[in-house]
Design a protein with these regions (language model features):
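Cap/lid segment of the alpha/beta-hydrolase catalytic domain
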Residues: 105-127
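Alpha/beta-hydrolase active-site loop
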Residues: 121-142
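C-terminal catalytic histidine-bearing segment of alpha/beta-hydrolase fold enzymes
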Residues: 223-224, 233-320
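Alpha/beta-hydrolase fold nucleophile elbow
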Residues: 145-155
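Short substrate-entry loop that stabilizes the transition state in hydrolases
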Residues: 63-111, 185-186, 206
Length: 320
């Protein structure tokens, strides 16, 4: 079966499961297997004949059978899922916001793992859209998830994949957050309106604001921030001026300007978090050690909290 057909089949299974749950009121379902709350589970899947894996975490709750929102976390290159989770504190955020957390591992070995986000034209690359759809189906066989509140968050290569998911699995996600990652190719004109938060440093040396630089390998391509924002503003119907907010804590060499187009009047909330003099880094309140030559890290905001707050207010209409 061609990749596109397999992907449509997996997405169709998601739709059938969603419809079945709507018949139960769309809110509750008994957990299919024994799953302990507050525990992280490692899961292995075979997708396209490849061994793939992810972990998922269910925060403690006094209503374990209730359907809950699902947050997909896509790690950057050189920082696999568990390492990245510890770095940005996603399990603590899942506890706070009540998200089921699922974090897939990219293809590769050791730390050298990445996702196929459309940056390289290689027919032998894995289909990570199919992997994502298969992973969601697998999670749905274990616990009750709220199909109207499936979110994706990623950094760098993982952030690029969140954009790709809006293209390859349209209508699946209720919102995305991409930090230091723009799409590998321009967004399609028929892309569905989707709440999006883009976070990018103006002096990012790895994925520059203006797109690939002379230091970017020739076989890698990705979009610049300005054109990506313009595309999302068109898709999401952002015609009014943005609401602006400045964040500036002294001592970190950066400032943050948050550009926000609320919905309504836009079709979907759209946010650009512009990190002035910021590098290829995840903003935090306390500086953290990271790879060299990645630029300044902003300590003006807690990006994990800001991203989860943005996602938690998004919900898509399910087709009945």
């Amino acid at each position: 079966m061609p990749k596109r057909n397999r992907r449509q089949w997996a997405a169709g299974c998601l739709g059938l499961a969603s419809s079945a749950w709507l018949g139960l009121g769309g809110s509750t379902r008994v957990m299919a297997r024994n799953v302990c709350l507050g525990v992280t589970f490692d899961v292995r899947l075979v997708v396209e004949g490849r061994n793939r894996s992810y972990f998922f975490y269910l925060p403690p709750t006094d209503q374990p059978a209730m359907a809950r929102p699902l947050l997909l976390g896509f790690h950057p290159y050189l920082q696999p899922n568990r390492m990245w989770e510890r770095y940005i504190g996603l399990k603590a955020a899942a506890d706070r916001y009540g998200f089921i957390l699922a974090m897939p591992k990219g293809e590769g070995w050791g730390m050298f793992r990445s996702f196929n986000a459309g940056l390289v034209n290689d027919p032998y690359d894995p289909d990570d859209l199919l992997f994502t759809a298969t992973m969601i189906n697998d999670i749905a066989s274990r616990v009750a998830i709220d199909r109207s509140r499936i979110y994706a968050m990623g950094m760098s290569n993982g952030g690029m994949l969140t954009h790709a998911l809006t293209q390859g699995l349209p209508g699946l996600l209720a919102g995305i957050v991409s930090v230091s990652g723009t799409p590998g190719t321009p967004l399609a004109g028929d892309t569905l309106a989707t709440p999006v938060m883009m976070v990018h440093g103006t002096t990012d040396p790895i994925t520059p604001w203006s797109g690939p630089s002379r230091l970017t390998p020739k076989f890698i391509h990705f979009q610049d921030v300005d054109s990506t924002l313009a595309q999302w503003r068109t898709i999401n119907g952002c015609t009014a001026d943005a609401d602006l907010r400045l964040y500036d804590r002294p001592g970190d060499k950066t400032q943050i300007i948050c550009h926000r187009w609320p919905a309504p009047p836009a079709l979907a909330e759209t946010v650009l978090v512009q990190v002035l003099k910021g590098g290829h880094r995840w903003p935090v309140l306390e500086k953290q050690r990271y790879f060299p030559r990645t630029g300044n890290q902003s300590t003006d905001v807690d990006m994990t909290a800001m991203a989860c707050e943005f996602l938690s207010r998004q919900q898509r209409q399910l087709q009945v």
